[in-house]
Amino acid sequence: VTICFISILTGLPAGSYGAGNDWMAQRFNVQNEPFPNLAWATCSWNMGAALFPLVFVPLTENTGRMPGYFVAYIIFELFLFGSAFADNFATLVVTRFFGGGASSVSINIVGGSISDVWKGDKARSLPMSLFGFTSVAGIALGPFIGSAIVQIGGPNTGLNASWRWIYYVQLIYNAALIPVFYLFLKETRGDVILKKRAKKLRKETGRPIYAESELNKPSVVRLLKVSFMRPTKMLLTEPVVIFFTLWISFAWGILFLFFSSVVQTFGTTYGFGILATGLIQLAITFGAVIGTVFNPFQDWLYLRTASKNQERPGHPIPEGRLYTSIPGSLLFTGGLFMYGWSSRPDVHWIVPTIGVCIVGVGIYSIYMGVVNYLTDAYEKYAASALSAASLGRNTFGAFLPQASYSLFNNLGFGWAGSLLGFIGAALSVVPAVLVLKGREIRARSPFMLESTFGGEDDEERKNNAGLTGVAGVAGGPPGAAGDYHV
């Protein structure tokens, strides 16, 4: 519960920023039409989220989860402070870049902690499902939190400006929770715990007792090299990674595009104010709740495939991870059409809101399908596959919102929604092809063939790979540790 709470808290600033657009445009003299220049701060947040984990998450494999949590969380707080007191727009863009990076590192470590504690597909199903929910909901809750704060904030002057209170409030409650996290969080990284025990025994007995990780520790340079090079190679040469990255990246880009387009469509069509549009965007979170409720059914379908696996009897097949993501992807597509064509004055506002909710169901379903499939199919290379997908996902989240104003203004709400829906429909083919032809596709992949575990240590090694692979759920790429502890 505590680590999932961290996932929500560190995701909130990503979505809450846009609630202060009107105030920031006046304060910084930044024009938001026809090009949404204020979206550069969202772009910088997501680019930080894409890049920072590649460098910093691998380091936690040696130092442990606890130092990583608190260093990342304190840096996150410091750059929230910088955003709150920014005196110009350039400062805001820069501080959000570092804040987004620290947020993503923190969330990645949350994913690692889950895999440290819960071993095996069945045991990890519920924690993974909840973590996937908090990863989406933390960002999706941001617009409502931000709009509620500016609605009751002070005048648009000086340090008491409404938009600054978005950061003040988050600074206060995040700082207040640091002691709580310190009390409840414990180190979960197994080899770090063993190193501490070995060190204690050496001190108490004087005997040369060492943990295996102390004797066979990869260098930081090697960790960082693999953390950058292998995901890049997979993103350029592995068709599954390429198409799954496009699939999840488009869905993630829509999540961030909605932060501006919902304000645009509901403000123009229904005359909704900032707080009302923030409430509308809660529909994405509600969609993620629905997806979470149905996720145990997906896990049940997946575990049943173990009896049909001829390649590795007794093990569920990777394609079993995608069964509900196919209808989920179609719901995502249908929700985009519904949102676009129902955003008209003669249609009640609840109809496009339902469309937003359906899109939220689809985003969650796609998200979980991609993460779980790549983890199963690539096993010991799961960390690198997820790094590639996460890099693309955050890059789309950075740049797709830049198209929001021109897309909906030039095409109109209906055709803009249709264009997005057609792209979503085309990408819905990806999981269907994998379910039908997955075995043949995996047989042609050098990475998948090499990564398949076997032998007496299969379960232990698979769990080790999952340790960093699951971290890809978080919102930034995991480290490369899964590529070493096998």
Which residue ranges define each predicted feature?
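Central cavity-lining transmembrane alpha-helices of secondary-active solute carriers
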Residues: 40-57, 282-295
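Structural signature of the two symmetry-related core transmembrane helices
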Residues: 67-81, 90, 288, 307-337
